[in-house]
Amino acid sequence: MNKLLPLFFINLENKIMKLPNYLYLLTIILYTSCNNNSDLVKKVAGMHQVIKTQYAPDKRVAVFDVHFNFSGDKMLASGMTDSKEAYLQLVASLKTMEIAFIDSIRVLPDTVVGNKMFAIARNSVINIRSAPKHSAELGTQGLLGMSLKILDKQGDFYRVQTPDRYISWVDKGGIQRMDKSEFNAWNNAKKVIFVKNYGYVFATKKSNAGIISDITLGGLLKYVSENATFYEVEYPDKRTGFIKKSESFIYKNWLQQLQPSKESIETIAKRMEGFPYLWGGTSSKGMDCSGFTKMVYLMNGFIIPRDASQQIKAGKAVDANLDFTTLEKGDLLFFGKKATTEKKQRVVHVGIWLGNDKMEFIHASGNVHTSSMNENEPNFDEMNKNRYLGSKRYLNVKSALIIDLKSKIKL
């Protein structure tokens, strides 16, 4: 073995660790092709890609960030994954290949998180970012009372997974950490859901009282008691307050009376008209295109994937001829760049078909508004008609990616 190889990888590591995994491994292969480890690295690279494709094909919902380099006469396997199965398969594969290696792989969550591996959102809306810093891109948002799984910690930020499986970072001020027993107690407790677009939790049973916090559409709090006009509620951090009954429901009762339909999809969607566009927004304070469709379906009793490029993978394909004739109210329309011989299809936008004679759909772009696919209508949307990719139907369709709130939700 080339004695300079370990030093070479140490010096090179800082530059190439930031590359995507496949480029990182390709770089290793190219630079080791003249030594005895090149065949070994190629085999490991192939094995790594197979496992990643099986367990973490989408890094937004799964973690498999594993790297390989050399330390002395042994290969060092480092990084992290949130899949114990992926880790075990990786280790077994390396042993089967009779590769001596140093195991420095973290299986999340681990001791960095401790026994409080769960959390509940404690603010009206929590901002969940792509990296552990306040200046990072907004990836998604969580609503008050939302259940979260904690995977990792870095500084004042926690890497969390939301019920739709999305993984990003939230600051410690937005969540109440819990151990498993506390988390189960919260989830099993009687709840109150807020059903108006925006409002307040009051300090006393008077609408002119001081406020404990604001609250937005879909927010959940623990039920304590009630009188004729207010529910007394408790936050995950034990604060208490009062919500107007006219703006909320007992969550269990709300779920039971839900009857998702084309009309209810349209009703909820139109209640959000004029809401501002916010990249990564998933609340009534602001929403992007897929955050809008996600909120509409949430208030109809379903958790759907977070991003448009994920939402297109759920449901039943409709409108094969791309002429809008077989669409029904409530179907999701997807837009973007069509596939070519060189590039895959790229989904960048989504809206909801309204099924009227104006050929209208409602979507978040600038703000939430209606547009038309009919060139004779004043709100004709030529740009989106030209980049229309197809549609999916969610209502009355069984799909592993569409979670019914009436079912037991696992984190």
Regions found by a protein language model. Give the residues of each.
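Bacterial Sec-dependent N-terminal signal peptides
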Residues: M1-K42
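...with weaker cross-activation on analogous glycine-rich loops/strands in unrelated enzymes
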Residues: I304-T370
